[in-house]
Swiss-Prot record:
Organism: Streptococcus pneumoniae serotype 2 (strain D39 / NCTC 7466)
Positions bound to Mg(2+): 262
Assigned protein family: Belongs to the class-II aminoacyl-tRNA synthetase family. Phe-tRNA synthetase alpha subunit type 1 subfamily.
Entry GO CC: cytoplasm
PROSITE patterns: AA_TRNA_LIGASE_II
Protein name: Phenylalanine--tRNA ligase alpha subunit
Pfam families membership: Phe_tRNA-synt_N (PF02912), tRNA-synt_2d (PF01409)
Single Gene Ontology MF annotation: transferase activity
Lineage per the UniProt record: Bacteria, Bacillati, Bacillota, Bacilli, Lactobacillales
Cofactor info, note text: Binds 2 magnesium ions per tetramer.
GO-annotated biological processes: phenylalanyl-tRNA aminoacylation
Coiled coil stretches, renumbered: none
CDD domains per UniProt: PheRS_alpha_core (cd00496)
Gene3D superfamilies found in the cross-reference section: Bira Bifunctional Protein, Domain 2 (3.30.930.10)
Length: 348
């Protein structure tokens, strides 16, 4: 065996032994070894320099051994690199393994705002009574907001201090009644009565304090058909109050005045804290004012082209904030709008 063959054998055995000793995470050590063996200035290149001393007859044989050694070592380096990568991935997977039997981490979830809860609950009550829910414009025409509600241009209730005007004829609605006017215009009474509620945000030029806000939410109801009477209104109000505040609640109607209804009434509910005995909530009266109502004024019907001698109707309106404050004992309306999570989380 020539000296070159011995050197090749020794280099091969030494390199293979060194590769077996390289562990995962030591890829640089393997790369350095590869350069030192197979690189341009590596051990194999140094051995090849001895080819000049080999006879012409032996050069093909020695060259074959050199190529075999190069192929074996190259394959060994590639196999080692593959094994190191597999070990690296396996170690990484082991460190990141998930125990599927462990309980999951709870996801922080939100909840509906108390006003949304109140609105949806009230809407569900009316839907169950056969009413339709109708939305409308918050930016409204003066004509629909006032004139169609029997509030002519010179009516004192149209004081500028009560309304946000955008132009002389465009304003932010002060109630959701314009939705009812448009609904009466569009309804085909030959197919039956109109039964609807119109929930939504309204705007008044009030100074914000514990009981007043420049914006709040109303739900107004309207029923128009043949032979609709005050008795129908009273029965409807009684049912609404009982569903919202409890079966034991009673109502009391007091005469009042609204331009768009005649007769008009204020609706009181028996105090749900003291049961009518008198307390701070009801101001010692046993009753709590809850909403306004009345029979639709004939002029309001006629402005929609409805024959007031054939058709009649009733209307009512209540504030969602008012209902929520009474039900949950909230004494400051501003809490609904300040975005305080501590306040909102009480009503999950």
């Amino acid at each position: 065996m020539s000296t070159i063959e011995e050197q090749l054998k020794a280099l091969r055995e030494e390199t293979l032994t060194s590769l077996k000793q390289i562990t995962a995470g030591n890829e640089k050590e393997m790369q350095d070894l590869r350069v030192s063996v197979l690189g341009k200035k590596g051990s194999l290149t140094e051995i090849l320099k001895g080819m000049k001393d080999v006879s012409a007859e032996m050069r093909p044989i020695i060259g074959k051994h050199v190529n075999e050694a190069r192929d074996v070592l190259t394959a060994a380096f590639e196999e080692t690199a593959k094994l190191l990568e597999e070990k690296k991935v396996a170690a990484q997977l082991a460190s990141e393994s998930i125990d599927v039997t462990l309980p999951g981490r709870p996801v922080a979830t939100g909840h509906r705002h108390v006003l949304t809860q109140t609105s949806e609950e009230i809407e569900d009550i009316f839907i169950g009574m056969g009413y339709q829910v109708v939305d409308g414009f918050e930016v409204e025409q003066d004509y629909y907001n006032f004139e169609r509600m029997n509030l002519p241009k010179d009516h004192p209730a149209r004081d500028m201090q009560d309304t946000f005007y955008i132009t002389e004829e465009i304003l932010l609605r002060t109630h959701t009644s314009p939705v009812q006017a448009r609904a009466m215009d569009a309804h085909d009474f030959s197919k039956g009565p109109l039964k609807m509620i119109s929930p939504g945000r309204v705007f008044r030029r009030d100074t914000d304090d514990a009981t007043h806000s420049h914006q709040f939410h109303q739900i107004e109801g309207l029923v128009v058909g043949k032979n609709i009477s005050m008795a129908d209104l009273q029965g409807t109000l009684q049912l609404i109050v009982q569903k919202m505040f409890g079966e034991e609640r009673q109502i009391r109607l007091r005469p009042s005045y609204f331009p768009f209804t005649e007769p008009s009434v204020e609706v009181d509910v028996s105090c749900f804290k003291c049961g009518g005995e008198g307390c701070n909530v009801c101001k010692k009266t046993g009753w709590i004012e809850i909403m306004g109502a009345g029979m639709v004024h004939p002029r309001v019907l006629e402005m929609s082209g409805i024959d007031a001698t054939v058709y009649s109707g009733f209307a009512f309106g209540l504030g969602q904030e008012r209902v929520a404050m009474l039900r949950y004992g909230i004494n400051d309306i501003r809490g609904f709008y300040q975005g305080d999570v501590r306040f909102s989380e009480q009503f999950k």
